[in-house]
Amino acid sequence: MNFQPLGKRVLVKRVEETKTTASGIIIPDNAKEKPLMGEVVAVSKEITDIANGDKIMFAKYGGTEIKLDNNEYLVLNLDDILGILK
């Protein structure tokens, strides 16, 4: 299923973080915070400085979670994006 964000929004797939600490302790899923980084999957036509495939950091409480084809995504407003990782 294709999803085209409208307005000044982007569709993001969260980047999974490691499930163990530096000392090797396994962190259970319910104890982990959701990552604040992701990869841009789709961009609205109004946004020109962010492209598909960009890695971004976003605000902790920003965005709306959606599920498409059994995958979880986040729809973010442009204002919730903190920066592009290069």
UniProtKB/Swiss-Prot annotation:
A GO MF label: metal ion binding
GO biological process terms held by the UniProt record: chaperone cofactor-dependent protein refolding
GO cellular component: cytoplasm
Presence of keyword Lipid metabolism: no
Subcellular location as annotated: Cytoplasm
Main location: cytoplasm
Pfam families to which the protein is assigned, alphabetical: Cpn10 (PF00166)
Key words of the record: Chaperone, Cytoplasm
Disulphide bond pairs: none
SUPFAM superfamilies per the UniProt record, alphabetical: GroES-like
Family designation: Belongs to the GroES chaperonin family.
Quaternary structure and partners: Heptamer of 7 subunits arranged in a ring. Interacts with the chaperonin GroEL.
UniProt function note: Together with the chaperonin GroEL, plays an essential role in assisting protein folding. The GroEL-GroES system forms a nano-cage that allows encapsulation of the non-native substrate proteins and provides a physical environment optimized to promote and accelerate protein folding. GroES binds to the apical surface of the GroEL ring, thereby capping the opening of the GroEL channel.
Entry protein name: Co-chaperonin GroES
Species of the source: Campylobacter jejuni subsp. doylei (strain ATCC BAA-1458 / RM4099 / 269.97)
Gene name for this UniProt entry: groES
